[in-house]
Amino acid sequence: MKKAEMGRFNISPDEDSSSYSSNSDFNYSYPTKQAALKSHYADVDPENQNFLLESNLGKKKYETEFHPGTTSFGMSVFNLSNAIVGSGILGLSYAMANTGIALFIILLTFVSIFSLYSVHLLLKTANEGGSLLYEQLGYKAFGLVGKLAASGSITMQNIGAMSSYLFIVKYELPLVIQALTNIEDKTGLWYLNGNYLVLLVSLVVILPLSLFRNLGYLGYTSGLSLLCMVFFLIVVICKKFQVPCPVEAALIINETINTTLTQPTALVPALSHNVTENDSCRPHYFIFNSQTVYAVPILIFSFVCHPAVLPIYEELKDRSRRRMMNVSKISFFAMFLMYLLAALFGYLTFYEHVESELLHTYSSILGTDILLLIVRLAVLMAVTLTVPVVIFPIRSSVTHLLCASKDFSWWRHSLITVSILAFTNLLVIFVPTIRDIFGFIGASAASMLIFILPSAFYIKLVKKEPMKSVQKIGALFFLLSGVLVMTGSMALIVLDWVHNAPGGGH
């Protein structure tokens, strides 16, 4: 039997779905036959039953926990929070500048609540479906098609996320090194070449961390990464009171004019608005323009963490669905506040002049400011330490798809990890710009992972609730909303390509 699939067992109502086995890498061998319930468990609600092996049926609950999770509650919060936060935080001020403060808060609230609701659906489906593997839930619900849909969505979304992180390394790290070494002419210097640097960082930092088998070890790097993002947020708030207005507008316009004279095609769309002294420092609460349509995909992608939910759940100490939902609520609320504050203070610093990447806007105003240089280092550290966490669900998906029935092998484990990292590096090095491709893949995959797959799995696998129940109707509405969001976002991106219009990045 696969590690994450077990027979049913009675537990108390306060501990629904407590204590699955922790075995993300399939290194244990178990009997393949599922046990039937004894009669004295027959009246227990299926949602409040647990899974165990046939050979241990009838034993007390504490005797069935052969491979309990080992990751603490706090470390799980760190891991999930780090899976949520990412490069999207750099684009949220741009999203607010193109939606207005009030509309942005409304969208951010709805997206965060919907994302948390989909985590609830996913955990409940995992309990009812008897599996802690995303792809296996897809297989149980819709056969091979469901398995491929889950695996493909996970892989697409995470490779897109990894690419965005490594693109930040590629373009920001050379600038940091150049500022630290005071080198004006970087021609021919390999250590100022972004392609070489992204390869070096991948080999020296990312690969060793990615080879860990247990996510708990990365909790420490997750905590450090989150501290880097908190530092970034603090600097964004402080700079709001240090950068005068409307002086920064004039500086941005001058920078734009200089860029236009040397590189006419390098115009930044966020700077193309007419600026008046009256409007340049006045916040807007509702804005609708050609760039507003990119706000929803940016926000959706910013909250995608669902491929990492089940692995984190599997390794949670004293795990139960209620305990994991508490982990999720804390993580989502913390990221909601971080996203809101970063977007708000970034927007109130530059207003409609904010660019699609917030750090670039600061560099246009303050140049080589020491504090901003430290922020760049912090962001680089954060995204670098996030990549190993993102690799885990990709490797799990590939392993389950290709080698589900095989025992764990370090050679296979390492080969899959190196292959994933190598493919992502090739994308970053050889694709001139991944923004449009990433936007299309991110919009489709993120909508699949947040809206469509969890609700579809829930409707199919949770048998104890009739289709006319409030829960099933809510899940169906959630599914239809996901289809609408996915098709709408993809259509708008295609229209953006057709009309060759500049778009916002994530």
From Swiss-Prot:
Disulfide bonds: C245-C281
Residue ranges that the UniProt entry lists as topological domain Cytoplasmic: 1-76, 124-158, 210-217, 314-329, 393-413, 458-472
One annotated Gene Ontology cellular component of this protein: plasma membrane
Binding site for Na(+): N82, T386
Region: Regulates protein turnover upon amino acid deprivation, residue numbers: 1-96
Side Extracellular, residues: 97-102, 178-188, 239-292, 351-371, 435-436, 496-506
Stretch list, region Disordered: 1-23
Membrane topology: Multi-pass membrane protein
Compartment(s): Cell membrane
Primary location recorded for the protein, binned into one broad class: membrane
A Pfam family it matches: Aa_trans
GO biological process, one term: neutral amino acid transport
InterPro entries named among the record's database cross-references: AA_transpt_TM
GO MF, any single term: amino acid transmembrane transporter activity
Glycosylation sites: N258, N274
Activity: how regulated: Inhibited by N-methyl-D-glucamine. Inhibited by choline. Allosteric regulation of sodium ions binding by pH.
Post-translational modification: Polyubiquitination by NEDD4L regulates the degradation and the activity of SLC38A2.
Domain-level remarks: The extracellular C-terminal domain controls the voltage dependence for amino acid transports activity.
Function noted in UniProt: Symporter that cotransports neutral amino acids and sodium ions from the extracellular to the intracellular side of the cell membrane. The transport is pH-sensitive, Li(+)-intolerant, electrogenic, driven by the Na(+) electrochemical gradient and cotransports of neutral amino acids and sodium ions with a stoichiometry of 1:1. May function in the transport of amino acids at the blood-brain barrier. May function in the transport of amino acids in the supply of maternal nutrients to the fetus through the placenta.
Family named by the database record: Belongs to the amino acid/polyamine transporter 2 family.
PANTHER family: AMINO ACID TRANSPORTER, SODIUM-COUPLED NEUTRAL AMINO ACID SYMPORTER 2
Protein name: Sodium-coupled neutral amino acid symporter 2
